[in-house]
Amino acid sequence: MKKTLLTISVLALSAFMLMGCTTAGAESDGTPEAEQAETAQYTLADTAGLLGKADADVADAFGGGEENWTADKSTYIGRIYQTELYGDPVTVYAVCGEEKVMDAVSIWITDGEQEVTDELVQTWQDRVTAFTGAEMEDRGVSGESGTQSWRWNAEDNFYTLRLLEDILTLDINPAVGELK
């Protein structure tokens, strides 16, 4: 009888502990819900805003970026951010020039792990068009690589959306020289 009572007590205690774990997992990390929702609502304005900024000034953008170096650590490339744009997970690569100033941004919307649908391409075309206010130029399919691309020439930057099989990226580059 004592053995049965002890077993039931241990099972009940274990069940209560497990219930406490699931409750703890469901709780917030201490960040207010409004702030969590706000941080997940990054847009193209946030990514384009990286251009021309010093690396030190954008280190904490999008919740913090990881330094990106060449394999031999001889050249600093820029930063990699794992974040969300418009609530969708993306990887943002910010590329620095020699002065550690952000020269270009590449947003990997998909990385080949999932199928790219026509709807997803259209959604991003609409987002870029709405953000830039520029007309989209269909660049067609490259004969060499098979990449399909679309381009927007905005006042200060140009935006190129590229699709290669199941990889969809958006590059943002400053308009310089003849492009300006």
Show which residues each predicted segment covers.
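Positively charged n-region of N-terminal signal peptides that target proteins for export
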Residues: M1-L5
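Sec-dependent N-terminal signal peptides
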Residues: L6-L13
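C-terminal motif of bacterial Sec signal peptides marking the signal peptidase cleavage site
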Residues: M17-G20
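Bacterial signal peptide processing site
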Residues: T22-A24
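N-terminal low-complexity, Pro/Thr/Ser-rich intrinsically disordered segments
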Residues: E27-D60
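Short, low-complexity, Pro/Ser/Thr/Gly-rich segments in the mature regions of secreted, periplasmic
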Residues: N68, E165-K180
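Long, charged/polar, surface-exposed segments that mediate recognition or autoinhibition
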Residues: L85-T147
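Short, exposed beta-strand-loop hairpins at the edges of beta-sheets
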Residues: S149-D171
